Swiss-Prot record:
SUPFAM superfamilies: ArfGap/RecO-like zinc finger, PH domain-like
Record's keyword annotation contains Zinc: yes
Keyword Coiled coil: no
Record organism: Mus musculus (Mouse)
UniProt keyword terms in alphabetical order: Cell membrane, Cytoplasm, GTPase activation, Membrane, Metal-binding, Repeat, Zinc, Zinc-finger
Location in or out of the cell: Cytoplasm; Cell membrane
Name of protein: Arf-GAP with dual PH domain-containing protein 2
Domain PH: 132-233, 255-361
Length: 381
């Protein structure tokens, strides 16, 4: 066996070695990484390897299977590995800081990787980890009634638990004052059409208000995201002092479980089917629907209780009901009524069924019962 094959075999054994963490990407957790940084000593996935290529002074990457590895490189990988390197570069990651997963957008992964290895924000044991606290700056915000993005000043007051934004730079009165209590932030780069697109939502007069913003700097928008998360965690600790931090962290911000177009009919089931954009919020157990993906407010929402409370989802439509253009149907059963939807493809239907069943099969948590009043579903169409 030549050096090439022998070293490849050693690397593949390292990938599977117990207690090393090498079987998942060191940066996003994706399973079975095929690349490695031979300068840092970590195994990473293809997507994260692309980010590492951008700073060769800090990290240099090779394919585990396709590139040539000499003995010294393999020895370096053997004496390092994912868990050992994480112990150094992730020694002091704040609880509020969002650690991206495999399916997260590129800007989150890129800034996480740069924060770890380039800026080394989480390494030195004697270095105090700074809390973002208050924050002020400009973001590009989409207009409520048009598609134009305009520059707006945002001010986060962490201690007061408020986010404000202003339509005029010198304006005294803010356009909106948003309580951190009801705020969520989630990256929606495809929907917004910008690689740094962030969706901020909050409750307003019984509805969910959507703000769509971005910043040209990836670092700036991720810093805003984590500052909002820090303020949210601070609020949760005050609101639920008896709960451990580990139970509060998953509640800081959340992503939609599933989004996409479906068609729906009205409560009498005789109304025409209309195309709507749907977003499933698993934490608040709401299926929200909009006329368009970037609308400021939802047209309506369906509260999703648990199977134990009589909530179900059926594959297909009730007998005698026919959709408009789309035939792959599903029916959400609540104690008050049936909500009937059709999906553009059978694949979409399967994904919606799986997502909805996942929410309905999970019991309402005590925290959810404290913070959310059960709603049966309402809407305009």
């Amino acid at each position: 066996m030549g050096d090439r094959e022998r070293n490849k075999k050693r690397l593949l054994e390292l990938l599977q070695a117990a207690g090393t963490g090498n079987g998942h990407c060191a940066d996003c957790g994706a399973a079975d990484p095929d690349w490695a940084s031979y300068k840092l000593g970590i195994f990473i996935c293809l997507h994260c390897s692309g980010v590492h290529r951008n700073f060769p002074d800090i990290s240099k990457v090779k394919s585990v299977r396709l590139d040539f590895w000499d003995d010294s490189m393999v020895e370096f990988m053997t004496h390092h590995g994912n868990l050992n390197v994480k112990a150094k570069f992730e020694a002091r990651v704040p609880a509020f800081y969002y650690v991206p997963q495999a399916n997260d957008c590129l800007v989150l992964k890129e800034q996480w990787i740069r924060a770890k290895y380039e800026r080394q924000e989480f390494t030195a044991i004697d270095k105090a980890v700074s809390h973002p606290g208050n924050r002020e700056g400009f973001l590009w915000k989409r207009g409520r009634d048009n598609a134009q993005f305009l520059r707006r000043r945002f001010v986060l007051l962490s201690r007061e638990g408020l986010l404000k934004y202003y339509t005029k730079e010198e304006g005294k009165a803010p356009k909106a004052v948003i309580s951190i209590k009801d705020l969520n932030a989630t990256f929606q780069t495809e929907k917004i059409g910008h690689p740094h697109g962030l969706q901020i939502t909050y409750r307003k007069e019984g509805h969910t208000r959507n703000l769509f913003v971005y910043h040209d700097s990836g670092k700036e928008i991720v810093d805003w995201f984590n500052a909002l998360r820090a303020a949210r965690l601070q609020y949760l600790k005050l609101a639920f002092p008896d709960l451990p931090e580990s139970e509060l962290v998953p509640l800081i911000t959340r992503n939609y479980l599933k989004q996409g177009f479906m068609e729906k009919t009205g409560p009498k089931h005789r109304e025409p089917f209309k195309k709507r954009w749907f977003a499933l919020d698993p934490q608040e157990r709401r299926l929200l629907y909009y006329k368009n993906p970037l609308d400021a407010f939802e047209l309506g929402q369906v509260f999703l209780g648990s199977n134990e409370q009589g909530y179900e989802v059926w594959e297909d439509l009730p007998k005698g009901i026919r959709g408009n253009r789309w035939k792959a149907g599903l029916t959400v059963i609540t104690p008050e009524r049936k909500f009937i939807f059709t999906c553009p493809t059978e694949k979409e239907q399967r994904e919606w069924l799986e997502s909805l069943r996942g929410v309905l099969s999970s019991p309402l948590s005590p925290l959810h019962l404290l913070t959310t009043s059960a709603e049966t579903g309402c809407g305009l169409g």
